[in-house]
Amino acid sequence: MSTKTLALIFSALWSACLYAAPVETLTQTCAQCHGETGVSTKAKIPHLNGQLSDYLEEDIRRIANGTRASTVPDHIPKSWTGEEVMAVADFYAASLGPRPAQTTDAAQVTRGAVWYKKRCADCHPDSGRESKRDAPLMAAQNLEYMKEQTRAFVSGKRKFVFLMDDAFKGLSAADLDGVAHYFASQEQFKK
């Protein structure tokens, strides 16, 4: 490799290091709703802590470019570089602070457990603590957020993979609420 090529590579790397914002700065906007460590302070806002980095990275990119619906579509800066998006996703994935316990309805949890086993467990195993097929982790996610998102999937406002359409097919609003109660009632991590 020539000296000129090495100099260009070094210069590009140095510039990237010099201009990449620290993750704490990048997450300041996120923290207003998702909390400093990704534990949301608002019922209809998802927890980000402990979520899969790849899932978060893809979601951030989709919200920023407008291909994923969001209640606050302009909250992710379009100027973030790929490295900055990865840094934010990695930051929240590594944040393992506990999510607060939620009030759930026992009858709804029982109803949701039945549907979870039939329709959700293949992609969200271990009661939503694990993932297959690029699915997000669901255990201990905000109840109101999950209820809102299931309605968005059913109405077509939000799209995921075809598997979600199959999973929701034929379920009533009460069944979907039951699944949300089931996931919300779970511990995020096994003890």
Predicted regions and their residues:
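His/Cys-centered metal/cofactor-coordination and adjacent catalytic loops
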Residues: L48, M86-T104, A121, P125-Q141
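C-terminal capping alpha-helices of c-type cytochrome domains
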Residues: K78-P100, E144, A167-K191
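N-terminal signal peptide c-region/cleavage motif recognized by signal peptidases
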Residues: S15-C17
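Sequence/structural segment immediately N-terminal to covalent heme-attachment motifs in c-type
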Residues: Y19-V39, P100, T104-S127
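Short pre-active-site segment immediately N-terminal to redox-active cysteine/selenocysteine motifs
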Residues: L26-T29, T37, K44, L52, ...
